[in-house]
Regions:
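C-terminal cap/substrate-recognition subdomain and adjoining C-terminal extension
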Residues: 2-111
Length: 111
C-alpha cells in the first residue's frame, strides 16, 4: 500500500480541502497567519514556494519510497530525495519539458 501526502505551496485552507479530495493522510502547505481572535491577517507565516526540500528530507527519513509529482520547476531541488520524480508540463509550456529533460527526469507528463 501507499500513503498519499500532499506537499503544496498553496495556503493551508486550500491545501486541506484538496487533501480531503485526494485522500491525503497528511498535508504540508504554506500557512496563513491568524490573529488571537482567529482572523486571518493576510500574511503568510510559512511559505513552501521553492522551500519544499526540507519537508521532503524529513519525509525521506521515515518513508520507504517517495514519489513526487509536480508542475513547478522550483521543486527540482527535491529530485535527489525521491525514488521517483514525475514532472507535469502544462499545455503551452514546451520550455518546461526541456527543463525537466535537462534535469534527467525520465517521466514527464505533457498536458
Amino acid at each position: 500500500g501507499f500513503e498519499v501526502i500532499l506537499l503544496s505551496a498553496t495556503v493551508d485552507p486550500v491545501a486541506e480541502s484538496i487533501g480531503e479530495c485526494v485522500g491525503a493522510k497528511r498535508v504540508y502547505s504554506s500557512e496563513l497567519n491568524f490573529s488571537s481572535k482567529n482572523i486571518c491577517d493576510g500574511t503568510i507565516g510559512r511559505d513552501l514556494l521553492g522551500n519544499k526540500k526540507d519537508t521532503m528530507y524529513e519525509l525521506s527519513l521515515v518513508s520507504n519510497e517517495l514519489v513526487f509529482v509536480t508542475d513547478n520547476k522550483s521543486d527540482s531541488s527535491c529530485i535527489e530525495l525521491c525514488d521517483e520524480f514525475i514532472a507535469v508540463v502544462p499545455s503551452g509550456r514546451k520550455k518546461n519539458y526541456e527543463f525537466w529533460k535537462d534535469k534527467g527526469i525520465r517521466r514527464i507528463i505533457c498536458l
